[in-house]
Amino acid sequence: MICNARQKEKGGKPTGLEYLEVGSRVRDDESKRNKVKVDEDHGLYEFFRHKDKALSTPAEEGNHGRPWSAEELRGKSWEDLHSLWWICCKERNRIATESYERDRLEAGYGEEDSEKRDMTVRRTQRAIKQVLTERYYSWQEAQVVAKDDPEIDLSGQGPIYTPRDFEEDIEEEVLAESEGEVEQKPAQITA
């Protein structure tokens, strides 16, 4: 038998987990454990789909939608895409946690459904990356076009966008000037 060294030094009798037989499994006496109060909204609970059970049933695991397509995501704002990305990350963590628990408990079910669900989430993340890449390339192209546009000033001095008159407006101004009538131009747009 093995006895905890601290208990021997104190001269006390070992209790609970301190006294074990060699080669035996640890037997936990729940009455001797301290009850730890845990916050109901603890962040680690987000690694599990349910607070009261470690694994989802096959029906729960197979009950999921389709991945978001890039076409659907193109209309979303940056904040929406950012939120959806982190929701996907949390979902992949839940899937990985349940997969680990399933292997640990040798449950023997749910692996195929779990892989399908993970593939769905990964496809959504791939679509988010595609949309953000498209936006980045569009932004780069817009910068190149803006450098050659006389209405746009990227120097940081003064207004960014100064609209020019349309050709029709210029022709009307020339006619008005020749007749002596000049209209006031609208104020410039600043950003």
Swiss-Prot record:
Subcellular location field: Mitochondrion
One MF annotation (Gene Ontology) recorded for this entry: structural constituent of ribosome
GO biological process assignments: mitochondrial translation
Family matches, as InterPro entries: MRP-L47_sf, Ribosomal_uL29_mit
Example of a GO cellular component annotation carried by this entry: mitochondrial large ribosomal subunit
Pfam families: MRP-L47 (PF06984)
UniProt entry keywords in alphabetical sequence: Mitochondrion, Ribonucleoprotein, Ribosomal protein, Transit peptide
Similarity annotation: Belongs to the universal ribosomal protein uL29 family.
Subunit annotation: Component of the mitochondrial large ribosomal subunit. Mature mitochondrial ribosomes consist of a small (37S) and a large (54S) subunit. The 37S subunit contains at least 33 different proteins and 1 molecule of RNA (15S). The 54S subunit contains at least 45 different proteins and 1 molecule of RNA (21S).
PANTHER family hit by this protein: LARGE RIBOSOMAL SUBUNIT PROTEIN UL29M, RIBOSOMAL PROTEIN L47, MITOCHONDRIAL-RELATED
Protein name, UniProt field: Large ribosomal subunit protein uL29m
Lineage, top ranks: Eukaryota, Fungi, Dikarya, Ascomycota, Pezizomycotina
Gene: MRPL4
